[in-house]
Amino acid sequence: MPPSRDQRKVLTSAPTSPAVAAAEFTEAGVLLAITYSIREGRRGEFFDLMRELKPLLHSIGGSDVSVYEDRSRPNYLMEVFRFKDEAEFTAFDDKFHKDRKIAAIYALLDDIVEAEKSDFKIFERRL
């Protein structure tokens, strides 16, 4: 239960700097988001493959990549790539489709995810 009005402390001044550094979103001009719905019991395999992929993706220009999980849907994950501009994204995309090892790992992921619940989107910064 929150404190009563009499027990609340009054702040005399606002903090001069934020406690947490805010992300600089102006750095990303293109975002690639790939969503995955992981089959029951295959979560460990998914993360093993993603750990194997990360250095390979980094080597072809995918240096800003993260994996997020939906808070309300277990085993529903999103891999997010951030690129500074269209040229950086295009260079990555060209190398991505030519790399046989990356293709082999994504082929293994196909068996782990439910394709009908997985998707990818490309977003461009507007503001």
Give the residues covered by each predicted segment.
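A compositional/biophysical signature of low hydrophobicity enriched in polar/charged and small residues
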Residues: 2-22, 29, 125
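An amphipathic, aromatic/His-enriched active-site/gating alpha helix that lines ligand/cofactor pockets
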Residues: 2-11, 54-64, 82-118
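Short helix-capping and inter-helix turn/linker motifs at the boundaries of alpha-helical repeat units
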Residues: 24-25, 67
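Short, well-ordered beta-strand segments in beta-rich or mixed alpha/beta enzyme
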Residues: 30-37, 66-95
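Short, surface-exposed ligand-recognition loops at beta-strand->loop->(often short) alpha-helix junctions
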Residues: 37-48
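Generic structural motif
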Residues: 39-41, 86, 125
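Short, low-order "capping/linker" segments at domain edges
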Residues: 119-127
